[in-house]
Regions:
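Class I S-adenosyl-L-methionine
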Residues: 1-163
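C-terminal target-recognition/interaction regions appended to catalytic cores
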Residues: 124-253
Length: 253
């Protein structure tokens, strides 16, 4: 977990304090898997604090492509329950489906006029990155060779295979982050078009419905931040609806 002193870690303790005051029946927390290994034990301390005030706490790492989100996105889920211990894996099994591909999510957006709205307007790559994109398509490859990368991404910890990569049509995408506009932030080059993803495409890969409004985002940066940092709506639905199903079956009392 790289952001060990991230101020957002404090949100864990805010959740525990809120649970102590309001006593909800359930508390759900989502984060990256590395949060469990934070050297300050923020995640585990929060779990213990919830236990101390009477909650049964379970947590699991899940991959969102198991519930139909078209990306490889691992997340650490914690559910604290005033009732019985919630089996998170059982909830995931209730909604498990075949992985959805990039093609399934965004292929119909290729026909849109890319200049109509901020949502469908691709970013303009640098001259060097445009050459790298062209290289991927000219050679019909999905991973940019090391020698084609800038020197800072050829050595040490910067040699991630997905950086400067092209998405596969027939697979889930890599994890969508706020860096989806830039190929130097991950495998964000479109499978069929010589550009990186648009905000509309990234939102689809995050499982946002097309009717969802991002009108509050006035800039490309704010739009990317909202989309990339979001909890995919499908995950929220699965966890909440799954808990309700367990309640109706009498497994959470």
């Amino acid at each position: 977990f790289s952001r060990r002193k991230d101020h957002k870690n404090a949100l864990y303790f805010v959740m525990a304090r809120a649970a102590k005051i309001f006593r909800p029946n359930f508390v759900i927390i989502e984060n990256v898997p590395g949060a469990k290994h934070d050297k300050n034990n923020v995640f585990l301390n929060t779990a213990n604090e919830l236990k101390d005030i009477g909650y049964n706490v379970s947590f699991e790492t899940i991959n969102l492509f198991d519930i139909g989100v078209p990306q490889k996105r691992k997340r650490l889920i914690l559910i604290a329950s005033k009732a019985n211990l919630v089996n998170i894996n059982e909830i995931i099994e209730l909604y498990k489906t075949q992985p959805k591909s990039v093609h399934w999510a965004i292929q119909d957006l290729m026909q849109l006029d890319s200049q109509d709205t901020l949502m469908d307007m691709p970013s303009k790559p640098s001259k060097d990155n445009l050459k790298r994109i062209d290289y991927l398509f000219e050679n019909n490859i999905y991973d940019l060779p090391n020698e084609q990368r800038p020197p800072c991404h050829q050595k040490g910890n910067h040699t991630y295979k997905s950086i400067y990569g092209r998405l596969h049509w027939d697979e889930p995408s890599q994890t969508i982050t706020s860096g989806f506009y830039s190929m130097c932030m991950g495998r964000y080059v479109h499978p069929q078009l010589p550009r990186t993803l648009t905000a509309h495409e990234a939102a689809r890969l995050q499982f946002f419905p097309d009717y969802f409004s991002f009108a509050e985002a006035k800039t490309r940066t704010s739009l990317a931040t909202i989309i990339g940092n979001a909890v995919p709506p499908k995950l929220s639905f699965v966890l909440v609806h799954g808990i309700l199903r367990l309640l109706n079956r009498g497994e959470c009392k």
